[in-house]
UniProtKB/Swiss-Prot annotation:
Domain of life: Eukaryota
Protein name (record): Polyadenylation factor subunit 2
Acidic residues bias (residue ranges): 418-430
UniProt organism field: Emericella nidulans (strain FGSC A4 / ATCC 38163 / CBS 112.46 / NRRL 194 / M139)
Main function: Required for 3'-end cleavage and polyadenylation of pre-mRNAs. Also involved in chromosome segregation where it has a role in chromosome attachment to the mitotic spindle.
Comp. bias regions, Gly residues: 548-557
Signal peptide (UniProt feature, chain positions): none
Keyword vocabulary terms for this entry: Chromosome partition, mRNA processing, Nucleus, Repeat, WD repeat
UniProt region (Disordered), positions on chain: 1-28, 416-478, 545-567
GO biological process entries: chromosome segregation; co-transcriptional mRNA 3'-end processing, cleavage and polyadenylation pathway
Matching Pfam families: WD40 (PF00400)
GO cellular component: chromatin; mRNA cleavage and polyadenylation specificity factor complex
Compartments (UniProt record): Nucleus
WD repeats: 92-131, 153-192, 195-234, 237-277, 280-320, 350-389
Length: 567
């Protein structure tokens, strides 16, 4: 793995003259998680063959090549604590970052700014890729086409979104005191959840159950049934605004919440009570996140810019405090007070202002943080034998790091200018926000009018047109109208006929059209260096009988989305 190095020789970094930025640009280092995955896949063996537990890396730089992904250390969450700063990114607008989210495959990171625009960063080299305009709730495809916009989704700011397990619904939380459940394909509001008395700051959808949770400025945590829009129960454990509510994706029985009362709590859904209280922050906690692999590792961010990591199985009590008993270890778990947990690792100066958002890479080796100081920073675990991170400016502060010689303020300014230059160059080469022309489909994506419940004509890939009926089906059972989209073939050749999924009209001879000139087609292909096979026909043979049922089987999608709320 290659990581970004925040240290180095201050006198002449990377060949640049003192006090200037002329000379070769600093090489962009990347994080290559592929090497650790390959190492794990090559060395692991199933349990029935023995030797499935591999040798642990020793504290030496020579063991760097033996680093394994967090999945190989499921029972050792301490190895995945992100203690080392990798890189920091800042957008051209230089506005506070309110949300960061990794794409499901982990190749890119999406960040949302205070002005409403959002940016896309490369997840390996952390370079800027593209920027999007601000606006309302919008649907985007990976090719950066704005597919759809929901105007006036709420009457006030939308604070959080959460997806259903089937990805057909999503939940929104707003400062207008309501939560709304939207149908993704129909782009309509199905249910409005009311019950909070103040701004709703966070929400989440259980990964396997039909259960919703929300946190509000009224200090309450509420559970909801998405089918009936009924509030199931309310928790009153916090004494100030609830800033984050997150279900664990590893242990589905756990819920974590954070609040401005400087604490975070872990609830067990089976007992419907808190089992852990996370203390240690000196300012209100603004966000938290679960590790995607280890259910006992929680990271929290505070309004003073500190980043703390907690291990639920290690209390880490300060000296002089009496340890408390976990409810699980008590003979009376229902009445035992929640166990107090203190951080296993503290990054006191992670940001210069409030940390508003945290998100883990899907593999669990990189943590991204977004802050009011306009920076998006990336954190990772330490390499074998590495301890220098304990003396960097993020752990002991800029003044102390400068006094110890581990960081230079002048070098930091030059480094910032270099990064800004690189971001400007990346933006010049970035992808373009491709706006969809109103009333038109996306290039290469078929669209068609479809009956309700069969998908969406505006959201390609979500549902599809109804397939043609099989031969002998009664006309009363067939779908109304022709819902089969045109399917142009060879768009580069204007003389090729357009085909459709529907059968040809009675008496028509589409395969013997005078517009089809195979001789001309053969010349065009030969000019491009394409050799046709021997016996290539010079004209089409008329088809006496059209395909029964219309079109070719498999060309028309017949997938009907699952509109259930839960699994």
């Amino acid at each position: 793995m290659a990581y970004y190095d925040d240290g180095g020789n201050d006198s002449q970094p990377f060949g640049r003259a003192q006090g200037g930025i002329q000379g070769p640009r600093r090489p962009r280092l990347v994080t290559d998680y592929g090497s650790s995955m390959v190492q794990w896949m090559r060395n692991r063996r199933p349990k029935y063959q023995g030797g499935h537990r591999m040798e642990t890396e020793r504290p030496s730089a020579s063991y760097m090549v033996d680093m394994l992904p967090p999945l190989a250390r499921i029972h050792s969450p301490v190895d995945s604590i992100p203690v080392r700063h990798l890189h920091q990114s800042i957008g051209k607008s230089k506005k506070p970052i309110t949300v960061v989210r990794w794409t499901p495959e982990g190749r890119r990171l999406l960040t949302g700014g205070h002005t409403g625009e959002f940016m896309l960063w490369n997840g390996t080299a952390f370079n800027f890729e593209t920027v999007m305009d601000k606006g309302d709730v919008k649907y985007w495809r990976p090719n950066f086409n704005n597919v759809e916009t929901i105007d006036d989704a709420h009457h006030d700011a939308v604070r959080d979104l959460a997806w259903s397990p089937s990805d057909t619904k999503f939940l929104s939380a707003s400062d207008d005191t309501t939560l709304k459940i939207y149908d993704f394909t129909a782009r309509t509001c199905d249910t409005v959840l009311t019950g909070h008395n103040w701004d709703v700051k966070s929400c989440d959808w259980h990964p396997t159950k039909g259960l919703l949770v929300s946190g509000s400025k009224d200090h309450q945590v509420k559970f909801w049934d998405p089918r009936t829009a009924r509030c199931l129960t309310t928790l009153h454990s916090h004494k100030n605004t609830v800033t984050a509510t997150k279900f664990s994706r590893v242990n589905n029985n756990l819920l974590a919440t954070s609040s401005r009362d400087q604490t975070a709590r872990v609830f067990d859904l089976r007992m419907m009570r808190d089992i852990c209280i996370l203390r240690g922050h000196e300012k209100p906690i603004s966000t938290l996140t679960w590790h995607p692999v280890h259910c006992s590792l929680i990271s929290t961010g505070s309004e003073d810019g500190s980043l703390y990591h907690y291990l639920l199985d290690e209390p880490n009590l300060p000296a002089g405090q009496i340890p408390t008993v976990a409810p699980y270890d008590s003979p009376d778990p229902a009445n035992t007070p929640a166990q107090v947990i203190y951080p296993a690792h503290r990054i006191q100066y992670a940001h210069a202002a409030t940390i508003w958002t945290l998100d883990w890479h899907p593999l669990g080796h990189i943590l991204a943080s977004g802050s009011k100081d306009n920076f998006t920073r990336f954190w990772s675990r330490a390499r074998p034998g590495e301890t220098s991170y304990l003396k960097d400016r993020f752990h002991i502060g800029e003044e102390a790091a400068e006094a110890q010689g581990t960081w230079s303020r002048n070098f930091g300014r030059r480094q910032m200018r270099e990064e800004e230059e690189q971001e400007l160059q990346d933006e010049a080469d970035s992808l373009v926000d491709q706006r969809k022309t109103p009333g038109t489909g996306l290039p290469g994506i078929q669209s068609a009018s479809q009956p309700d419940g069969l998908g969406s004509s505006l959201l390609p890939g979500i549902g599809a047109a109804q397939p043609p009926p099989p031969p002998g089906l009664s006309t009363s059972m067939a779908p109304p109208g022709n819902a089969f989209p045109p399917n142009p073939v060879f768009p580069a050749f204007p003389f090729a006929p357009p085909f459709s999924g529907a059968p040809p009209a009675s008496g028509a001879q589409p395969m013997n059209s005078p517009n089809v000139n195979l001789a001309e087609l053969q010349k065009q292909l030969a000019a491009q260096g394409i050799t046709l096979p021997p016996g290539f026909p010079h004209h089409f043979t008329p088809v006496s009988t059209p395909l029964a049922g219309g079109g070719l089987p498999g060309l028309q999608g017949g997938y009907q989305p699952d509109n259930n709320y839960g699994r």
